A protein has these predicted regions:
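A cross-kingdom marker of C-terminal helix-rich interaction/assembly modules
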Residues: 1-277
Length: 277
């Protein structure tokens, strides 16, 4: 029998490697940026902001996986990573019309306008007026860039995420993308009790805390983050050889035999968490 403490020790080494991958990615993104990059340098500035947000989400997912009881949140955060990847893919895709700079603006302006519509009823202590002023300033600056660059085309919205991920799912090693994205809604919206919990007698088993689930979600997180990072890097400089090296590090972690053994339910019988009713 493998004790829970031993299993956690095995997980720690994998989580540390996954976290280190994000530092490698951010370092390379910084290296690939235009040295004179400012808020209005497109697509570089837009790529930088989107990848920074995705990195924060990714690290949050790894952090949640370190504690069995909170690991369910990693699957919820995976949804954000896949959506960030879809936006980066849109910017990279010449078939979407215009140049990359304008596609980056189509995403940024679209997201900015869509986000402003969700702030309806705010808590009394939140200065909604000040937020809206800052938001409007940003939108005006983006609109100036749009006009200056002579951009055209439909703005990207949240409704475009699914179709983009469907296209990504037709590529080698990415067939899981669209299905996983759809399934994450079960944890985001908290209706997936059929696979998250299992009741036995007077106790409820936390299925999501099983090693196999945590290992599987780790593999999805690393894959999504690695692929979205590569997409961002290639937008900045497609020919840099370090991108291939980064890709190999991400692939090596996903294909790590230990990770696959854990995902294959090797330790599930030795590790169960129950909440007494």
């Amino acid at each position: 029998m493998t004790l829970p403490a031993e299993i956690e020790g095995l997980f720690t080494s994998l989580f540390d490697r996954a976290t280190e991958l994000s530092f490698d990615a951010r370092h390379l993104i910084d290296e690939l940026l235009d040295i004179d990059c400012t808020f209005g340098t497109m697509p570089d500035a837009g790529i930088y902001r989107l990848h920074l947000a995705a990195t924060s989400t990714y690290r949050g997912g790894i952090f949640c996986l370190r504690v069995p009881e909170t690991s369910i949140n990693a699957y919820s955060l995976l949804r954000g990573l896949l959506e960030a990847w879809s936006h980066l893919e849109f910017i990279a895709d010449a078939g979407s019309g215009g140049d990359m700079g304008c596609r980056a603006l189509r995403y940024e302006i679209g997201a900015t306008r869509e986000w402003s519509n969700v702030l309806h009823a705010a808590p009394s202590y939140f200065d909604k007026g000040a937020w809206l002023l800052g938001h409007d300033d940003k939108e005006r600056e983006l609109q100036k860039l749009w006009d200056k660059c002579g951009c055209s085309g439909r703005l990207r919205t949240y409704g475009d995420v699914g179709p983009t991920l469907k296209v990504l799912a037709t590529r080698p090693d990415m067939e899981w993308v669209h299905g996983v994205w759809r399934s994450t809604s079960a944890t985001v919206h908290m209706y997936g009790t059929d696979f998250l919990l299992a009741t036995k007698g007077d106790a409820t088993r936390l299925v999501w805390a099983l090693p196999s689930y945590r290992a599987t979600w780790l593999a999805f997180l690393v894959s999504a983050y690695s692929f979205l990072s590569i997409t961002a890097m290639k937008i900045l400089n497609e020919d840099d050889s370090r991108i291939v090296e980064f890709h190999e590090r991400g692939r090596a972690l996903v294909e790590e035999p230990l990770l696959r053994q854990i995902a294959g339910q090797m330790f599930d019988e030795d590790y169960s968490l129950y909440e007494e009713s």
